[in-house]
From Swiss-Prot:
Post-translational modification (record): Monoubiquitinated at Lys-1002 by the DCX (DDB1-CUL4-X-box) E3 ubiquitin-protein ligase complex called CRL4(VprBP) or CUL4A-RBX1-DDB1-DCAF1/VPRBP complex; this modification promotes binding to DNA.
Annotated catalysed reactions: a 5-methyl-2'-deoxycytidine in DNA + 2-oxoglutarate + O2 = a 5-hydroxymethyl-2'-deoxycytidine in DNA + succinate + CO2; a 5-hydroxymethyl-2'-deoxycytidine in DNA + 2-oxoglutarate + O2 = a 5-formyl-2'-deoxycytidine in DNA + succinate + CO2 + H2O; a 5-formyl-2'-deoxycytidine in DNA + 2-oxoglutarate + O2 = a 5-carboxyl-2'-deoxycytidine in DNA + succinate + CO2 + H(+)
Binding positions for Fe cation per the UniProt entry: H1085, D1087, H1681
The protein's name in its UniProt record: Methylcytosine dioxygenase TET3
Length: 1803
């Protein structure tokens, strides 16, 4: 990018560097209206080494002016070391080459202009651009400008000259009388141009060859100093002749010096900041030009051209000659024989021979063209023309195009830009780059190569032009600055194209610009366009385009007034450019007009200079660009309009445009100039349109253009395309300057102001820019605003490169790195530090992130004033707190958020809180920045109260929690959100958000986006949520706008474009999405994907007990800035007041931050891990389901057999339980049960396969889709049969028996009843097991419960508790008892509800153990339930027996044991399984699980037989999701099947277990574990089948037991987390009961106050306590922020709901980016098609073809997939169910899921 920028930058730099006298600098290369400075030219010729410092003429107005204006860039920025632009000698403003031409006129004032321009442009551009500045100057210099400057010396280029009103017509009117001057110099100018072109070529070579300034004699420096001092004395635009004459120094020496200066050699006393000394460069250029003019005055300047120039830029004779001159350059390219110069150029420039030849041809043509003196000829030889009085006006442009195309033009242009204060070098250059860059710069390289000299370097120069062309373009843009059309010139002329400036000027000022500028502009435009086109073809050109962005510099006069030295502009070019592109208007006139806007970009040209370097390396061969044949006709046509345009000088930017446009040459919009705009915004908006037809026109006009095409057929083709696309009028418009004006607006086509003489060129130039890269193209050819719209999208890129494709969008042809820069939105909004001298270097790491969109000021008092104005209240209403950035994050030992200082609302009077940071070491305008704004009364209280209730109710039931990385510490081991997945803190996302898959909005492919999606199908709830959020967004936006207007504006910029991705009901929608965080602890993070200069707006809603000011609630959540500490003083610097705040509580200083340490037993799995596991689980589940469905009978039989397996506890768990469960499965309707269980628990879980932590499934269950800790929030379960529990758990614990199962009565759900999260507490309260059973199934006693609908069940569950509540057995036994009744009803009801109830029952079933504990209830319930629901079971011992046996172990109570024993005894392994299965399965399984949950259900479940299923349930109960899982797949099945047999089996174990409670539990857990290990093995298939029959999610015993195992392991973690999981496995039920409380106790014991943070005062931790209905605004993208963990998070009744409104940085596409997605899909489809064709060609099968296409991404995986598929096909149907799942499903789901695009259709 820098390379591309370099050319443009060079010009700007030159302007800055060569601002000897400010005025001169302004003129830059275009000292004269278009004349290159004679000295400059000479220097250029000589390579710049021999250039001598030119002297001020002492006669022009600027020279006679003794006081600085104080407003120009030179005055305001003394670093440029440039004399005030208004005092810059007119002579010095002209390039040396121009002076030579102008010397004829220069003496009349033209010379000075030309010389100044030459110097500036030449030196600036030559290093990178190629032609020496003088060459550029001579070619492109606009005599019209010179005319204008006649009074002031060099007004034409003077556009850059602050003093010369004639500059660009801004400083003064173009003088018609100057026309004679120009005319007089016309011949010489032509010669000068030719010389300049040669000089440029030579200079480019020399510049590269020259190693140091050592070659320069100190005498040169002395001369320079003398002249500079003289110039400083007289800033008037006195004639440049004096300077020129001084240029008598050895030309070689001057050229060498120039080359060295351009390479960084500065005079000993130079204090310039830039790499070059703008003044010295300008002076050298002036010298060289003056010498060139002296020696080259003989050069035929197009005489005709001069008069037209006088008449007006439009004068075709002048312009055409220039065009001819330029064009001739092109023709020589075509037929130029390979010469030594060409070879040397090729060698030195490392360019192709063709390019070198083209350059040489251009050089020759430029010199020859001046002779013809017809407009074409002149156009062809812009440099010479620039030298001539008439040429000067156009000359700047021509000169830019021809002489400095390679090197000089950019520099010369910069010189001009610097010379004229109106053209800040940077901005003007960019403008010219845009306007001229498009037209003139391209033309100049082509024309200037031949025109300045036929040296072999012309090609190199041309190439440089490509690289340098951007410089030229810059200079062209600068030139518009210098030109009367200051608008454009201002932006670009100073920096990049002084010559172009004259063109705009001429356009603005009809007299000067009319004829000569017309021709010259045409020639320049043609050349520039051509070159631009080439640049577009090559990356460098794209950069040049960026310079063109600066094409809008104002007239030199305008720029001069700004006083920003043209050379300086490079510093500001980027911004300026962006601004300038808007400035350029449709025509050259418009360009001139825009020039003033461009003015600022003058400085940036210096930066552009860097791009120049890149430009020097033309990516796009100049040869093609040089072809001007096609442009010639356009140039001629454009010429006619030019005169008119010239007659009416457009604004500077427009002037630049008009200059370029004046030249009928079609600008080469397609030329991509990759040069930063002089202003520093090297990139022009990609869509920016630049009209630089003028250069093209010039090329066309010039006969040389014809010859050039032969040099390169492609070039010729390009020219023709330009002609066709741009038409003749393309020369007229000055879009280049316009685009330059708006370089920043990348995809914007800015039409240059239309010149009065020509309609807006249809071929507007499109400027595509990003970062430092700008691409100029003709995409906008036929649309005035074609810029943005014309820019093709990525998807539109042609598969094969074509000229038309390139013209449409050069970006398509950029290399990947460049394209990445252009395509990466983040690159576009890089932070830009303010320019201040407070510190040497801004280090954000030390002073904190820098941003000002929240507000900034020099002092805290200024912030107060600012915020008082914004809020509308004063005094105490606004509270400002100072914070200090330390960079040391405050966090707990586990890496979780803590607070050290808490800022609270102290009184109701306080309305607004602002946190401000003083940037260490700064005392500038942005020394203090606002980092946080908190409006305590952000929304109406009523609205906040309503929102809190609505969101709590809705999200608790239907919310789908989002797993966020910030929810965990770095190790993923903390449980800050809470351990209960049903109540833990969670965040919910709504609105549009980013999708990496779509690379855009996640709704890109959604026909009916559900922005407020909830789980399940709940349109009404979603509508409520939508209304709530939309209303809130509408309510908050105005406040946001009032408190942070800049941030607000940044966020609504693209609202109209991407309104689909915005929230809000009224215009002004700054938000795209909202995240609802409910008791969610967000660990320290930055919202990296938020809009770059946007903010997050957080609306806080708090619990009822935290809505009063002055009261600190028991539990609260704070918003923390971990890297800041509180200042010791208040906003007024008073420590006492600060201490008073602390004592009053307004600031709470903490000495510790005690928080319970909640830790996960093992690190939580990442989203990716969970996804992979989910896929695997889903595949296995499908396989199991298929197997179950396919062989239910077989499974049943196996289940029965398993049930008959040994009753040994271990066996029962493994085999016995499995058998029992299997038998029950058989007895129970497998499908019904399966579906019931499956849908009750697993169905939901599976529906959230991608929920991640939010999954309802058991975190540790193998069967769960995701294996994650229960800590992860689980989505609200779908209502069971329409029943929605108000509890976080699924109604009846879909996934098993969640401890807080909503289905269960609140008493059971309560931590006390269930033992929070399966904690011992619930187990302790086990007595409610029966009650739980009753509540779960009111008909526990009867089978009715199972039959009840889900809602009824839930209701019953809630109510019936008392019935089975008998607390006789507080342990799991009670739960078991209730389970028994449940089992029987559940088994009865095969309906899903039954299944649901069975889940409940299952829990209860497990509770039959409780019945054991409760001898009464168990026998009664068990017998009743067993008998009623399962006669066999009851007979066998009834559920009581079964459960009793099972529960006996867990319960450990003698009663239970006895009962259980009896029951278990009654329940033979085989019988009870059989009986229980039916009812137990549906009921028992679920019941058992729930009951177990309440107790240390795990212990109960651990009971051998039942344990596996019930145990799972119990575990699940501990971890509701687990139960769900088990209930769904494992628990439920296990419950029933295992219940029977396991209970029987577990009788012995269980009885002992019952007796030894904890021991039993241990046994149970151990057996479960063992069973998990064993069972899968012994009865894996049968169990699996049985499970399947039951509809269990587990595919096999392994799965079931695996789930159990995982649960067991998980359970342990759960126990730790929930308080029961850990102990139950190894200890008994009793212990399990204890385990919950124990864990809690342990957790309570594990507290941390993060002492270490409070020992170091520099560790941050400033927190604010957001109040109810408050609105907090902060830049979350830049500031590290966090929210503290709550002591007892419960999202069912959240302590704090924070609604975070934000806008993603890239959600700026209409219709959610559907068009982009479709385009991408088309592209992928095409690729897929190609792959298929390739596969067909290679004879690959369909499968192989798929793999073939995906190999790169999937590698082995893909191969495996095909194999699987083959196996699948080969495998018999009996295996088909499983195989397809494994191979096809697994592979496809896995691999294809990862693949984007066309692959999806292969799934």
């Amino acid at each position: 990018m820098s390379q591309f920028q370099v050319p443009l930058a060079v010009q700007p730099d030159l302007s800055g560097l060569y601002d000897f006298p400010q005025g001169q600098v302004m003129v830059g290369g275009f000292q004269g209206p278009g004349l290159p400075m004679a000295g400059s030219e000479t220097q250029l010729r000589g390579g710049g080494d021999g250039r001598k410092k030119r002297k001020r003429c002492g006669t022009c107005d600027p020279c006679r002016r003794l006081e600085n204006c104080g407003s120009c860039t030179s005055c305001t920025n003394r670093r440029t070391h440039q004399i005030c632009k208004l005092r810059k000698c007119e002579v010095l403003k002209k390039k040396a080459g121009l002076l030579k031409e102008v010397e004829i006129n220069a003496r009349e004032g033209t010379g000075p202009w030309a010389q100044g321009a030459t110097v500036k442009t030449g030196s600036e551009l030559s290093p990178v651009d190629g032609p020496v500045p003088g060459q550029m100057d001579s070619g492109p210099v606009y005599h019209g400008d010179s005319r204008q400057l006649s009074t002031s010396g060099a007004p034409v280029n003077g556009a850059r000259e602050p003093a010369g009103p004639g500059l660009l017509g801004a400083a003064g009117p173009w003088r018609v009388d100057q026309k004679p001057d120009w005319e007089a110099a016309s011949g010489p100018t032509h010669a000068a141009r030719l010389e300049d072109a040669h000089d440029l070529v030579a200079f480019s070579a020399v510049a590269e060859a020259v190693s140091s300034y050592g070659a320069l004699s100190t005498r040169l420096y002395e001369t320079f100093n003398r002249e500079m001092s003289r110039e400083a004395g007289s800033n008037g635009r006195g004639p440049r002749p004096e300077s020129c004459s001084e240029g008598s120094e050895d030309l070689d020496t001057l050229q060498t010096a120039l080359a060295l200066a351009r390479h960084g050699m500065k005079p000993p006393n130079c204090t310039c900041d830039g790499p070059e000394c703008p003044d010295f460069l300008e002076w050298l250029e002036g010298k060289i030009k003056s010498m060139a003019m002296e020696g080259g005055q003989g050069r035929p300047r197009l005489p005709g051209a001069l008069p037209p120039s006088e008449a007006g830029l439009p004068a075709p004779s002048t312009r055409p000659p220039l065009l001819s001159s330029e064009v001739p350059q092109v023709p020589p390219l075509e037929g130029l024989p390979l010469s030594q110069s060409a070879l040397s150029i090729a060698k030195e420039k490392n360019i192709s021979l063709q390019t070198a030849i083209a350059i040489e041809a251009l050089t020759q043509l430029s010199s020859a063209l001046p002779q013809p003196s017809h407009s074409t000829s002149q156009a062809s030889c812009p440099l010479p023309e620039a030298l001539s009085p008439s040429a000067p006006f156009r000359s700047p442009q021509s000169y830019l195009r021809a002489p400095s195309w390679p090197v000089v033009p950019p520099e010369e242009h910069p010189s001009f830009a610097p010379d004229s204060p109106a053209f800040p070098p940077a901005t003007p250059r960019p403008e010219f780059s845009e306007a001229w860059g498009t037209d003139t710069p391209p033309a100049t390289p082509r024309n200037s190569w031949p025109v300045p000299r036929p040296s072999p370097d012309p090609m190199a120069e041309l190439e440089q032009l490509l690289g340098s062309a951007s410089d030229y373009i810059q200079s062209v843009f600068k030139r518009p600055e210098a030109l009367p059309t200051k608008p454009k010139v201002k932006v670009e002329a100073p920096s990049s194209s002084p010559a172009p400036v004259p063109s705009p000027i001429s356009q603005r000022e009809a007299p000067l610009l009319s004829s000569e500028p017309d021709t010259h502009q045409k020639a320049q435009t043609a050349l520039q366009q051509h070159l631009h086109h080439k640049r577009n073809l090559f990356l460098e050109q794209a950069q040049d385009a960026s310079f063109p962005t600066s094409t809008e510099p104002q007239a030199p006069g305008w720029w001069a007034p700004p006083g920003s030295p043209a050379p300086r502009p490079p510093d500001k070019p980027p911004k300026e450019k962006k601004k300038k592109p808007p400035t350029p208007a449709g025509g050259p006139v418009g360009a001139e007009k825009t020039t003033p806007g461009i003015k600022t970009s003058v400085r940036k040209p210096i930066q552009i200079k860097k791009s120049r370097s890149r430009d020097m390396q033309p990516l796009f061969l100049p040869v093609r660009q040089i072809v001007l044949e096609g442009l010639k006709p356009q140039a001629s046509e454009g010429q006619a309009p030019l005169p008119a345009q010239l007659s009416v000088p457009p604004p500077a930017s427009q002037g630049a445009a008009s200059q370029s446009c004046a030249t009928p040459l079609t600008p080469e919009p397609s030329l991509a100039l990759f040069a930063p705009s002089p202003s520093g915004d090297s990139l022009l908006p990609p869509t920016q349109e630049m009209r630089s037809p003028s250069p093209m026109v010039a090329l066309q006009s010039g006969s040389t253009g014809g010859p050039l095409p032969p040099a390169d057929d492609k070039l010729e083709e390009l020219i023709r395309q330009f002609e066709a696309e741009f038409g003749d009028s393309f020369g007229l418009p000055g879009p280049p300057s316009v685009p330059i004006q708006e370089p920043e607006n990348q995809s914007t086509c800015l039409p240059a102001p239309e010149s009065p003489f020509a309609t807006r060129s249809p071929k507007k130039i499109k400027i595509e820019s990003s970062g430092a890269v700008t691409v100029l193209s003709t995409t906008c050819f036929h649309s005035e605003e074609g810029g943005q719209e014309a820019t093709p999208t990525k998807a539109e890129n042609p598969l094969t490169p074509t000229l038309s494709g390139f013209l449409e969008s050069p970006l398509k042809y950029l290399d990947t790195p460049t394209k990445s820069l252009l395509d990466t939105p983040a690159k576009k909004a890089q932070s830009e530090f303010p320019t201040c001298d407070c510190v040497e270097q801004i280090v954000e790491k030390d002073e904190g992130p820098y941003y000002t969109h929240l507000g900034s000021g020099p002092t805290v008092a200024s912030i107060r004033e600012l915020m008082e104005d914004r809020y509308g209240e004063k005094g105490k209403a606004i509270r400002i707190e100072k914070v200090i950035y330390t960079g040391k994050e405050g966090k707990s030992s586990r890496g979780c958020p803590i607070a050290k200082w808490v800022i609270r609302r102290h009184t109701l009077e306080e309305k607004l809180l602002c946190l401000v940071r003083h940037r260490a070491g700064h005392h500038c305008q942005n020394a203090v920045i606002v980092i946080l704004i908190l409006a305590w009364e952000g929304i109406p209280r009523s609205l906040g109260d309503t929102l809190y209730q609505e969101l709590t109710d809705t999200l608790r039931k239907y919310g789908n929690p989002t797993s966020r990385r910030c929810g965990l510490n770095d190790d993923r081991t903390c449980a800050c959100q809470g351990k209960d997945p049903n109540t833990c803190g969670a965040s919910f996302s709504f609105g549009c958000s980013w999708s990496m898959y779509f690379n855009g909005c996640k709704y890109a492919r959604s026909k009916t986006p559900r922005k407020f999606r909830l789980t399940g199908d709940n349109p009404k709830e979603e509508e409520v949520l939508r209304n709530s959020f939309q209303d809130l967004a509408t309510e908050v936006a105005p406040l946001y706008k009032r408190l942070a207007p800049q941030a607000y504006q940044n966020q609504v910029t693209n609202e109209d474009v991407a309104i689909d991705c915005r929230l809000g009901l009224k215009e002004g929608r700054p938000f795209s999405g909202v995240t609802a965080c409910m008791d969610f602890c967000a660990h320290a993070h930055k919202d990296q994907h938020n809009l770059y200069n946007g903010c997050t707006v957080v609306c806080t809603l708090t619990k009822e007990d935290n809505r009063c000011v002055g009261q600190i609630p028991e539990d609260e959540q704070l918003h923390v800035l971990p890297l800041y500490k509180m200042a010791s003083t208040d906003e007024f610097g008073s420590e006492e007041n600060q201490n008073a705040k602390v004592s009053s509580g307004a600031i709470q200083v903490l000495t510790a931050f005690p928080r319970e340490v909640r830790r996960l037993p093992e690190p939580a799995k990442s989203c990716r891990q969970r996804q992979l596991e989910a896929r695997k689980a889903a595949a296995e589940k499908k396989k199991l389901q298929k197997e179950k469905l396919s062989t239910p009978e077989k499974i049943k039989q196996e289940a029965l057999e398993l049930a008959g397996v040994t009753t040994d506890p271990g066996l029962s768990l493994k085999g016995g339980l499995s058998q029992q469960s299997l038998k029950p499965s058989l007895k129970v309707e497998p499908q019904n049960h399966f579906s019931s269980f499956k849908y009750s628990g697993n169905a939901v879980v599976e529906s959230y396969s991608v929920l991640g932590s939010c999954r309802p499934s058991d975190p540790y269950s193998m069967s769960s889709v995701y294996s994650y800790h229960s800590r992860y929030a689980q989505p609200g379960l779908a209502s069971v049969n329409g029943f929605h529990s108000k509890y976080t758990l699924p109604s009846f614990g879909y996934y098993g028996f969640p401890s807080s199962n909503p289905v269960f009565p609140s008493q059971f759900l309560g931590p006390s009843a269930w033992g929070h999260g399966g904690s011992g507490g619930s187990f302790e309260k086990k007595p409610d097991l029966h009650a739980l059973h009753n509540s779960l199934n009111p008909a526990y006693g009867g089978a009715e419960f199972a039959e009840l609908p889900g809602q009824a069940v839930a209701t019953d569950n809630h109510h019936p508790i008392p019935h089975h509540q008998q607390p006789a057995y507080p342990g799991p036994k009670e739960y078991l008892l209730p389970k028994v009744p449940q089992l029987h009803p559940a088994s009865r009801d095969p309906s899903p509800f039954a299944q649901s109830s069975s889940c409940y029952n299952r829990s209860i079933k497990q509770e039959p153990i409780d019945p054991l504990t409760q001898a009464e209830s168990i026998p009664r319930d068990s017998a009743k339930m067993s008998r009623t629901p399962l006669p066999e079971a009851s007979q066998n011992g009834g559920p009581s027996h079964l459960w009793g046996q099972y529960s006996g172990g867990p319960s450990m109570s003698p009663k239970r044991t006895n009962s259980v024993g009896g029951n278990w005894g009654v329940f033979p392994p085989g019988e009870s399984p059989t009986i229980v299965p039916d009812k137990l399965n549906s009921f028992g399984a679920s019941c058992l699980t729930p009951s177990h949950f309440p107790e240390s259900q795990w212990g109960l479940f651990t009971g051998e037989g039942q344990q596996s299923a019930p145990h799972a349930g119990a575990r699940l109960r501990g971890k509701p999701w687990s139960p769900c899982k088990f209930g769904n797949g494992t628990s439920a099945l296990t419950g029933p099947s295992l219940t029977e047999k396991p209970w029987g089996m577990g009788t012995g174990d269980f009885n002992p277990a019952l007796k030894g409670g904890p021991g039993f539990q241990d046994k149970l857990w151990n057996p479960v574990k063992v069973e998990e290990g064993r069972i899968p093995t012994p009865g894996a298939n049968p169990l699996d089948k049985a499970w399947q029959a039951f509809g269990m999610p587990l595919s096999s015993n392994e799965k079931l037991f695996g789930a159990l195992k995982s649960e067991e392991k998980l359970w342990d973690p759960f126990s730790l987390e929930e308080g029961t999981a850990e102990e139950p496995p190894s200890k008994g039920v009793v212990k399990e009961e204890k385990s919950g409380p124990t864990v809690e106790e342990d957790e309570e014991e594990l507290w941390s106050d993060s002492e270490h943070n409070f020992l170091d005062e520099n560790i941050g931790g400033v927190a604010v306590a957001p109040a109810h209905c408050s609105i907090l605004i902060e830049c979350a993208r830049r500031e590290l922020h966090a929210t503290t963990p709550l002591k007892k998070p419960n999202r069912c009744h959240p302590t704090r709901i924070s609604l975070v409104f934000y806008q993603h940085k890239n959600l700026n596409q209409p219709n959610h980016g559907l068009a982009l997605w479709e385009a991408k899909m088309k592209q992928l489809a095409e690729r897929a098609r190609q792959r298929q064709e390739e596969a067909a060609r290679l004879g690959l099968g369909q499968q192989e073809a798929k793999l073939y296409g995906k190999k790169r991404k999937w590698g082995g995986a893909m191969v495996a997939e095909p194999q699987h598929k083959e196996k699948k096909g080969a495998i018999p149907t009996r295996q088909a169910l499983a195989m397809p799942t494994d191979s096809a499903v697994t592979v496809s789901s896995y691999a294809y899921t990862k693949v984007t695009g066309p692959y999806s259709r292969w799934i």
